[in-house]
Curated annotation (Swiss-Prot):
Zn(2+) binds at residues 27, 207, 232, 236. It comes from the Bacteria. A motif ('HIGH' region) lies at residues 29-39. It comes from Rubrobacter xylanophilus (strain DSM 9941 / JCM 11954 / NBRC 16129 / PRD-1). The gene is cysS. This is Cysteine--tRNA ligase.
Length: 470
């Protein structure tokens, strides 16, 4: 069976991986700040998509980039009085830490823009040779959009309707819509030598060069947020197809919807962001996965504490049903039927544009089927081995925590708990245990009651506290 992706350019479903191989390129972060929970959406979704493809035998090469030179990075460095390289190091580490908290795997290749300056210069030279780009007297180089007749096809805009996105002087441009391929250096800014003088690359040329370097046959899927469909992806398309008109660039463009807060796009420029680390520690990894995966990746999604709490309860319900049958060693005909239907529905959903909401619905339906049987006949709990195996495999594929008892150590306190527990909950359990050791009983009781109100029970044992869901 094939895997199909809804292509933003054509609007149709495009089959990928016909030869058993899939190359995926996703635009990564510009590392000048901590990533927020809206930034996480694309990385978490593509982590799941790649897991699914590999589970079905596809050989996947997965690439996302790090934009490590940009005006925002330079401005942040100047504000803090440190080098731009220190800003890049700090926020790349921060990005990786937040991915680990969410259980998001790393790509096969994570190229950095500054490691590909020669490839960018070669690409710009080819665009100039073909008449798609021109150097300006001040050392800048611009792409001439009027030389590319398909400009606007990806974003479904006519050039005369487009908003000019580049700030600053346009006196050297032939057309206000022309965009920068190479920026002449300014005093004190990082720069690299080029045929047009010292400078640095524009944002859009970076991804074109890195796709060409790491996926030389073109990307089967190019992912990114719907907010960069224009101008970034539109400009990538113009650059790569302008330089290599006879070479495939992207077979399917896949854009994920924006995360909204109070009906407004979550963005640093708006000031309504929630740090991905803060959200993960507060709500837990599984709740965030359930929240993001129960909506189709292409649709916008709303964030609030209330929504995340609802998703946490939903996830806990599913995992509780799984744990009810987790000790099964025999398989009844009902178990085999539910397992077979689950695998079939899950596979069909994921092969049709990675439909995670339908895949999760299949998980709930199968688990609920087992739950109804156990409610009417408790002894049936040991007869669902085949369904247990299917649930374990598919929940794990989506990145949910299906482990049994865990032990977390927080500030010297060992805490046992079933499955995942949010970091801030574990911190309060540790505070309570330290209060008990100091015989500060009112504080220990206060923390216990606070956690009880939030649905967490604590059992005090000689080996330390045991945390569980009520």
């Amino acid at each position: 069976m094939s895997v199909k992706v809804r292509d933003s350019l054509s609007g149709g479903l495009v089959e990928v991986g016909g030869d058993g191989r899939v190359g995926i390129y996703v635009c990564g972060p510009t590392v000048y700040n901590h990533i927020h929970i809206g930034n996480v959406r694309g990385h978490l979704f593509w982590d799941v998509a790649v897991r699914f493809l590999r589970s079905r035998g596809y050989r996947v090469k997965f690439v996302w980039n790090i934009t490590d030179i940009d005006d925002k990075i330079i401005n942040r460095a100047n504000e803090e009085g440190v080098s731009w390289k220190e800003i890049v190091r700090r926020y790349t580490d921060s990005f990786h830490e937040r991915l680990r908290l969410l259980g998001i795997g790393m790509p096969d290749v994570e190229p950095r823009a500054t490691e590909h300056i020669p490839e960018m210069i070669s690409l710009i030279e080819e665009l100039i040779r073909r008449g798609h780009a021109y150097p300006a007297p001040n050392g800048d180089v611009y792409y001439a959009v009027e030389t590319f007749p398909r400009y606007g096809a990806l974003s479904k805009q006519r050039p005369e309707e487009m908003k000019i996105t580049e700030k600053g002087q346009t006196g050297h441009k032939r057309n206000p819509l022309d965009f920068t391929l190479w920026k002449a250096s300014k005093p004190g800014e990082p720069s690299w030598e080029s045929p047009w003088g010292p400078g640095r690359p524009g944002w859009h040329i970076e991804c074109s060069a890195m796709v060409e370097k790491h996926l030389p046959g073109g990307a089967d899927i190019h992912g990114g947020g719907s907010d960069i469909r224009f101008p970034h992806h539109e400009n990538e398309l113009a650059q790569s197809c302008g330089a290599h008109p006879d070479r495939p660039f992207v077979r399917a463009w896949a854009h994920h919807g924006m995360v909204r807060m109070a009906a407004q796009k979550m963005a640093k420029s708006v000031g309504n962001v929630v740090d991905a680390r803060e959200a993960t520690l507060k709500h837990g990894r599984d709740a965030i996965r359930m929240w993001l995966l129960q909506s189709h990746y292409s649709q916008p999604i709303d964030y609030s504490d209330e929504i995340l709490e609802e998703k946490r309860r939903s996830c806990e319900r599913l995992l509780r049903l799984y744990r009810e049958i987790s000790r099964s060693e025999a398989s009844s005909p009902l178990s085999d039927r539910l397992a077979g239907e689950l695998r079939e529905r899950f596979d069909a959903a994921m092969r049709e544009d990675f439909n995670t909401p339908e895949a999760i619905a299949a998980l709930f339906d199968a688990a609920s089927g087992a739950g109804r049987e156990i409610s009417s006949r408790p002894s049936a709990a040991g007869e669902f081995a085949s369904l247990k195996e299917a649930l374990q495999e598919l929940l794990g594929l989506l990145g949910f925590d299906v482990a049994g008892e865990r032990v977390s150590e927080v500030d010297g306190v060992r805490i046992r708990h079933a499955g995942e527990a949010p970091g801030e909950v574990l911190e309060r359990v540790a505070r309570r245990e330290r209060a008990r050791r100091r015989r500060e009983w009112p504080e220990a009781d206060r923390l216990r009651e606070e956690l009880l109100r939030e649905g967490w029970a604590i059992e005090d044992t000689a080996a330390g506290p045991v945390l569980s869901r009520r």
